[in-house]
């Protein structure tokens, strides 16, 4: 995303406890703030953001694999998580290999493509509420639906995600990822800046045809 704007201040925290302290401080001083991941699905006003942006960066991007479970911090690249799944012959995240953005943002909006979405694999999230307190959501507590989750409704920030995948064959997983990425290149102008999708694809058709 190359649609860049300025903010009064940007903070890249190094730990979850650091985020908690920052949020509590900003709340106590009534300072406007927003928390963002990679910014892949955001558009700012021309004048930028009048407040503090807390950005998930490299310190909060760790990815761990435990058998068929992947635990990823919210700042991790979704594409990197998909590649980590491939590396360990885990299937279920092929759809995510070409989706830009962070894991936290993807879970927040239940990102998906090609009949796959985050709600199909997420089993637990560690979140931060608007008062700087930790909240854990499990299973159906996420209330996932099309591009929606309880994380939006409750004004939560996703800090860490636990995903359950299935053991598969690496060559088949790679083949599926290659196929989906080829379809993206064929239909989407990936060489241009983008603020994300706008239209929902109707059953049996696709948004581009209707717009045309």
Annotate the PLM regions:
Residues 1, 63, 93, 107-109, ...:
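Short clusters of hydrophobic/aromatic residues that line enzyme substrate/ligand-binding pockets
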Residues 2, 71-73, 94, 108, ...:
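Conserved beta-strand segments that form the floor/walls of ligand-binding pockets within enzyme
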Residues 3-103:
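Anion-binding (especially nucleotide phosphate/pyrophosphate-binding) glycine-rich loop
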Residues 11-16, 43-61, 108-138, 153-160:
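Structural signature of FAD isoalloxazine-binding scaffolds in flavoprotein oxidoreductases
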Residues 19, 74, 78, 118, ...:
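Generic structural signal for well-ordered, non-membrane alpha-helical segments
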Residues 41-42, 82-85, 93-97, 110-117, ...:
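A generic local secondary-structure boundary/capping motif
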Residues 42, 128-212:
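Phosphate/pyrophosphate- and phosphate-bearing ligand-binding catalytic cores of soluble enzymes
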Residues 78, 82, 96, 100, ...:
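Hydrophobic, well-ordered secondary-structure segments
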């Amino acid at each position: 995303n190359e649609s860049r704007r300025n903010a009064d201040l940007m903070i890249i925290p190094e730990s979850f406890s650091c985020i908690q302290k920052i949020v509590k401080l900003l709340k106590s001083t009534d300072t406007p703030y927003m928390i963002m991941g990679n910014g892949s699905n955001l558009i700012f006003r021309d004048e930028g953001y009048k407040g503090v942006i807390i950005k998930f960066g490299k310190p909060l991007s760790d990815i761990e694999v435990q058998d068929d479970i992947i635990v990823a911090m919210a700042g991790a690249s979704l594409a990197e998580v998909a590649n980590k799944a491939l590396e360990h012959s885990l299937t279920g995240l092929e759809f995510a290999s070409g989706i830009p953005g962070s894991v936290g943002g993807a879970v927040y909006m239940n990102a998906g493509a090609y009949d796959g979405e985050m709600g199909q694999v997420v089993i637990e999230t560690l979140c931060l509420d608007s008062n700087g307190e930790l909240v854990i959501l499990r299973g159906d507590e996420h209330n996932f639906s099309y591009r929606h989750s309880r994380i939006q409704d409750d004004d939560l920030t996703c800090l860490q995600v636990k995903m359950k995948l299935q053991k598969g064959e690496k060559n088949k997983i790679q083949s599926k990822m290659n196929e989906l990425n080829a379809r993206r290149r064929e239909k989407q102008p990936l060489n241009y800046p983008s603020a994300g999708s706008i239209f929902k694809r109707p059953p049996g058709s696709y948004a581009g045809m209707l717009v045309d």
